[in-house]
Amino acid sequence: MASRNSPLNPSVHFDNFRNWLELEGEAERQRMESRRNRLTPAEAERSGSTLLNMVVTSHTTGLGGRYLLTLQKRHAPERLPWHRFRVGSPVSLSSEQDHRPLSGVVSARRRDHIEVALNKWPEGDSFRVDMTPDEVTRKRQREAMDAAEHATGRLAKLRDLLLYHADPDFGEPPEPEGAEHLDDSQRQAVAFALSAQDLAIIHGPPGTGKTTTVVEVIRQAVANGQRVLACAPSNTAVDNLLERLIATGARAVRLGHPARVLEVVRSHTLDALVEQHDARPVIQDMLKEADQLERRSRRYTRARPAPGQKHQQRKEARELRRHARMLEQHAINQLLADAEVICATVSFDFRVLDESTFDLLVIDEACQSVEPGCWIPLRHVQRVVLAGDHCQLPPTILSGEAAQQGLDVSLMQRLVEHFGDTVTRQLTVQYRMHEQIMQFSSDHFYDG
């Protein structure tokens, strides 16, 4: 039986998390700064967190005008040294000529090169690439908590429920159609989640089919004409969810940097779908013409150009780029409007959705996310279903002080401890675990 807590003051609650995020950010900065200060450039490279003397060997342009740079070693182009860079790693790119680093993301890695996505073209001939802290995610988390604290309308009602000022509501549980492949506990969980007017939680030990159950909740919601926002803390978990949704025939679009998406589902990313859109050839022609005009405006000629000619060329290039962005945005809006399910990590920048709202938010592996992360997608939804295992390891926290004070307590764990069976359904049949391990897990963590 859960023990009910007193209602939480929104200002105090969110201020606590703001302070803990500061502690976490400082812990991450100190760890990277310590590593950088105590290591020479050569040692930093040997540690795997830095690549030196990198040169741009080719580049392309991606969605939103991002530059995708291919970088190789200047003096050893056949192979990169061992390094920790992974697809999706946030990085900084700096040169000897311009010491102001540019922020980017690793979009691909091969034996002889890495590809980095940047919003600006870097100045210089030779570059240093360093791993960097992920400050962008913490900024989004703070903004989401600010919005929740001062919210009106549906977000305010969800906030009040999640901070214990109200109780959850449920309708009559429907009988899920076409769910014969599920066991009894999974079907009950699906029906329970679909009956929730604001909050439901699905939990269970490893191997009980939580993601299978979540996918069925989404499939049933879509069949009822609802739009769904499907999230998880990690890119791998989102891609796993997306792959299963695609198999059900759902029209799903994956938001997020293609560099962070598994290749098997990359064709469903917004970037890939825009590339295939009817407007793409026109957009590419506009950008190509803009590039040519800008090159002409910078080109030296012996003959004196007509007065204002170069200025006019740059102006025309800007206009072409503006029209290309408008066409691209129209394609994006169309693709998002046609989607039944939008998939993304909880920390994604959902501004691309503008004022769009969804009937249902599902967060898989919710216990692996710090609470501030969950408030980011909550801004766009009517109700939420959380799925995960609150008896497993909590989110990874670098700051011992922040973890001790409460940053390592997930939103799902907090709600399970407060509301208990009122909002939860447990999956009970384990499909993939050694029998003795399964019994130990059941006895020690799930009350038998």
Give names to the regions the model predicted.
Residues M1-R86:
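A helicase ATPase "motif cassette" and its flanking acidic/Ser/Thr-rich regulatory loops
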Residues P173-P174, R219, R227, C231, ...:
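Conserved P-loop NTPase motor core of helicases/translocases
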Residues G204, H257, E365:
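The Walker A (P-loop) glycine that initiates the GxxxxGKT/S ATP-binding motif of P-loop NTPases
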Residues S3-N16, E78-A191, A247, V265-K288, ...:
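Pre-ATPase regulatory/linker segments immediately N-terminal to the P-loop/RecA-like helicase/translocase core
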Residues S185, A196-I202, G225-Q226, E340, ...:
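Pre-Walker A (Motif I) flank of P-loop NTPase domains
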